[in-house]
């Protein structure tokens, strides 16, 4: 998953990097690293990002329980 794809997912949910990281229980440094191309999400993280893209509210609801 490219940095551009990750940025597009975050832009699609209209959240700042800080809010995105907090709401989806991710480290801000991790999200920043992914978006800057310094880190690459592993398979599980890439799948999680795809879930966020497909159904952000579903993921937020699941994390809230």
Say what each PLM segment does.
Residues 1-12, 50:
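A short, Lys/Arg-rich alpha-helix, primarily the initiator
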Residues 7, 23-25, 36:
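Short amphipathic alpha-helical segments, especially helix-boundary/capping motifs
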Residues 14-32:
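Short alpha-helical DNA-recognition segment
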Residues 21, 36-65:
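Short, Lys/Arg-rich amphipathic alpha-helical interaction segments
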